[in-house]
Amino acid sequence: MTPSAATAAKARTSFDVQRVRRDFPILAERIHGKPLVYLDSANTSQKPQAVLDAMDDYYRHANANIHRATHLLSERATALYEGARGKAAAFINAPDPHTIVLTKGTTEGINLVAQSYGRSVLREGDEVLISWLEHHSNIVPWQLVCEQTGARLRVAPINDAGEVDLDAFDALLSPRTRIVAVGHVSNALGTVNPIARIIEHAHAAGAVVLVDGAQAVPHFAIDVQSLGCDFYVFSSHKMFGPTGVGVLYGRASLLEAMPPYQGGGDMIASVTFEKTSYNVVPYKFEAGTPNIGGVVGFGAAIDYLSGIDRAAALEHEDDVLAYATARVSEIPIVRIIGTARQKTGVLSFLLEGVHPHDAGTILDREGVAVRTGQHCAQPIMDRFGITATIRASLAIYNTREEIDVLVRALERVRGVFA
């Protein structure tokens, strides 16, 4: 047995995927009379029963506003909400729960940094550096703040495998580079960026670094202190939690210096018509009544992931991805988009002569859920001279047997368009 085969065999025996699958009620659904094969977790992940139960229990036994009352229900809700903040800090090894800002998701976290930090420090002639791999949420906020400040947006190119050209990235760093904003993992291609190296080189140039971790957090453990990043953002719904909740981790000194992003209740210390003073970090960034039930569910999702052997889960996912890549590549009309040496969770491809949307419709009739389109990453499509791809994206609950179903469904697509 080769080392790679031995590793794959170990992954299949040390990680009990069938036990994990039983934790997710929706995986028992039938779609058009066929068992659901859910291969769209990069879009949004499914939710374990523990998350559903936690949210149900909150609404039944603790539903109240937080930080605003002394009655028991409010105290329960506040404890659950702040407990989730503490869990999030521990989950990414943040130094203190007060470095965790709870947001609506990754998109809001990036916009918050762009408008609160970026708009405060950027001046005409300054530069923000991103890469061609970015999700629109890590492009457009920087375009907006560059338009507002006169700063310039620079973009590091990628090679034909879908990897950032690190020499070109380094060449774009200069004393004018104030902010570097990069994805940890590409949502469209699955490329895992050498993020520690990128952070090190950006810091050497004097830049502050934001990492979009939306596609990384579901797959492997994150340690923001070890990485040394200044900001790290991610979403609950990508990691088995509810929608409408996310995290912005920020270096404490930066968060303290940043002005509020929005005004409203709970982000204030005192208000008069003449002057308002603001609450302490992180509360000055959390205006208004938050998605309390969602945050409670997010806390339960962290508990769920923390109870799993993350290393064994990643080995399992890598095995399924390698199997999927090999099996799908056997189909004569397939073209794989994104062949980086380091990938996780995503297989993006085309079927020659078949529009991805047509393929997606037929796959759905076979019970297979994939995403087709630009994946909120139009520049990547432009880079490869295409308009869209079929994207199969994986999570801890996917299996080799589901990949076999995908391949049979793709053969049916091929037959329809032959």
What are these language model-derived features?
Residues 1-418:
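Pyridoxal 5′-phosphate
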